[in-house]
Amino acid sequence: MQFVLFGPPGAGKGTQAKFLSEELNVPHISTGDILRENVKKGTALGLKAKSYMDKGELVPDNLLIDLIKDRLSQPDCRKGFLLDGFPRTIPQAEALDEILDDINKKLDGVINIDVGSGELIRRLSGRRICRSCGASYHLVFNPPKAKDLCDSCGGELYQRDDDKEVAIKNRLDVYVRQTQPVLEYYKKKNLLIDIDGEKEIDEVTADVKAAIRKLA
């Protein structure tokens, strides 16, 4: 089975991706992993991508699409795949349609882990990091024993700038602007499966599982 996975920062997408990959026995493929792997191996596509990454530039669509096509053509994708981080735009979604046509596959579904902005801000803004050892805590989900102090080394805990509410809102705004048209694209194709990501992790997983079973 072939799926694409969407979810904003803080939605628990990584947890569900791990479950889905194991449940379906298919590889979890993220664009970040593909880029890192090709750069590490020094492939022709990887070297091209590295030339952009070294300059701090975005890897252009045509190169990213070639990398995706190459990865989806690998033997471990014969039984299916879980694609994460692609497509992010309508042209990329259309390119994915063409790739799948070329390899005689089709998407079974597009899973969107949906969480409201208020809950996402609560989840993301609660993170605290130790200045000394880098240990990570969360004021709600994994609080330190003593306020503002690291359990491991006693170092001071602080909130990173990108975990502050204004920065989080900006990240979420960018995510919504970027992905909403793509979600609409898949909704029109009757492929979109919205999952309530505000429930407990086990409940979200159960809902994802139920959605997959309906398609099997």
UniProtKB/Swiss-Prot annotation:
Coiled-coil annotated spans: none
Region (NMP): 30-59
Subcellular location: Cytoplasm
InterPro entries per UniProt: Adenyl_kin_sub, Adenylat/UMP-CMP_kin, Adenylat_kinase_CS, Adenylate_kinase_lid-dom, P-loop_NTPase
EC number: 2.7.4.3
SS bond list: none
Binding site for Zn(2+): 130, 133, 150, 153
Record's GO cellular component terms: cytoplasm
One of the Pfam families matching this protein, by short name: ADK
Pathways involved: Purine metabolism; AMP biosynthesis via salvage pathway; AMP from ADP: step 1/1
Keywords: ATP-binding, Cytoplasm, Kinase, Metal-binding, Nucleotide biosynthesis, Nucleotide-binding, Transferase, Zinc
Catalysed reaction equations from the record: AMP + ATP = 2 ADP
Chain positions recorded as ATP binding sites: 10-15, 127, 136-137, 199
Keyword Zinc in annotation: yes
Main location: cytoplasm
Region entry LID, spans: 126-163
Chain positions recorded as AMP binding sites: 31, 36, 57-59, 85-88, 92, 160, 171
GO biological process, one term: AMP salvage
Function of the molecule: Catalyzes the reversible transfer of the terminal phosphate group between ATP and AMP. Plays an important role in cellular energy homeostasis and in adenine nucleotide metabolism.
Family stated for the protein in its record: Belongs to the adenylate kinase family.
Domain-related comment: Consists of three domains, a large central CORE domain and two small peripheral domains, NMPbind and LID, which undergo movements during catalysis. The LID domain closes over the site of phosphoryl transfer upon ATP binding. Assembling and dissambling the active center during each catalytic cycle provides an effective means to prevent ATP hydrolysis. Some bacteria have evolved a zinc-coordinating structure that stabilizes the LID domain.
NCBIfam families given in the database record: adk, PRK00279.1-2, PRK00279.1-3, PRK14527.1
Quaternary structure and partners: Monomer.
Protein name per Swiss-Prot or TrEMBL: Adenylate kinase
Species whose genome carries this gene: Methanocella arvoryzae (strain DSM 22066 / NBRC 105507 / MRE50)
